[in-house]
């Protein structure tokens, strides 16, 4: 969705406010040239203050982008586009983020075993055009339903003990072949499950560029 404007888009200073290997990989494979800034946002929001789990995810993505912008401003840098993203796993209206321990990871996978859960990835984009002095933002989230097969306690224990998925929302990474073998079906954007909804991101980047940077 952005291939025809990629050359022009890549003339902008674009920041990815994430050090996630998968987000870095897939944004790069899309052909976008960008720099990486690790946002210092602590991700310590009170979930009970949000009307929905998706609002919580959106706010995390927003604050990641905003904090990255503040960090760059302190270094006298002004990018054109900052992309913040956050992913959560949702089951029974409960949020499964990155587990804090191996035991918590095992508990998460036990709850998800044999069931359909939802992966929500929220994206927040801050933009600034220095030529027109215009700025703004855009936010969205993408949902993908993932169905797990039945996972035995032995399988869960082996996976967690050997692959230690403490950096994965929901305690699994679909890009890891062992974890991919848990998945019976996927309904929605595969890349969304990895942490970056490529299709929806492309649509939003295109709209931001055409509306705010394309010379009329």
UniProtKB/Swiss-Prot annotation:
Q: Which Pfam families match?
A: Maf
Q: What is its main location?
A: cytoplasm
Q: What's in the keyword line of the UniProt record?
A: Cytoplasm, Hydrolase
Any one GO MF term held by the record is: nucleoside triphosphate diphosphatase activity
Q: Which InterPro entries does UniProt cross-reference here?
A: ITPase-like_fam, Maf-like
- List where in the cell it is found: Cytoplasm
UniProt catalytic activity: a ribonucleoside 5'-triphosphate + H2O = a ribonucleoside 5'-phosphate + diphosphate + H(+); a 2'-deoxyribonucleoside 5'-triphosphate + H2O = a 2'-deoxyribonucleoside 5'-phosphate + diphosphate + H(+)
Cofactor or coenzyme needed: a divalent metal cation
This protein's GO cellular component annotations are:
cytoplasm
Q: Of which family is this protein a member?
A: Belongs to the Maf family.
Q: Which NCBIfam families match?
A: maf (TIGR00172)
Give the protein's biological function.
Nucleoside triphosphate pyrophosphatase. May have a dual role in cell division arrest and in preventing the incorporation of modified nucleotides into cellular nucleic acids.
Q: What is this protein called?
A: Nucleoside triphosphate pyrophosphatase
Organism of provenance:
Dictyostelium discoideum (Social amoeba)
